[in-house]
């Protein structure tokens, strides 16, 4: 396939089909594609899974990037498929944002600009609802998350490997999916 949109779709479908969400991974994962592929364990959380999508798009010549942000409440569009996989809120509709960090992917399509893709959320829904690929709900979520963003999410940045000044004790910061602070040279967790 030579058309970039179709290539990106094939990559999205491959990633959501062959990768799995691993809830034992800390935070959103590190997005270390080399390590994921070398280990042969095609799993992780949103940064890991969407970083594989980004890497495969780039390998096919499609500009792509991760986008780090946070969910600001319960999903309206996708809640019919999963009550917890796409954000949450209390009974008054107030967002539960502790742990709501989420990495999405974006790819560039000439004439359109940056388009969203989120195979990681397909794997999250699959695990949360104990459904397999091919299930109509999984397929509906997959269809929506290629080219759409649920409007309960806001992106903050798309950077990786930040070199802070003064330099962080741990060296470059992988991403700003979470706040980072140090006190007297010690990272605050």
Where on the chain are the PLM-derived regions?
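Active-site-proximal, glycine-rich beta->alpha crossover segments in alpha/beta enzymes
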Residues: 1
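Acidic/charged, solvent-exposed loop-and-adjacent secondary-structure segments enriched in E/D, K/R, S/T
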Residues: 11
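Active-site neighborhood of thiol-dependent amide/isopeptide-bond enzymes
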Residues: 4-6, 14-103, 125-128
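Active-site rim recognition segments
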Residues: 74, 78, 84-189
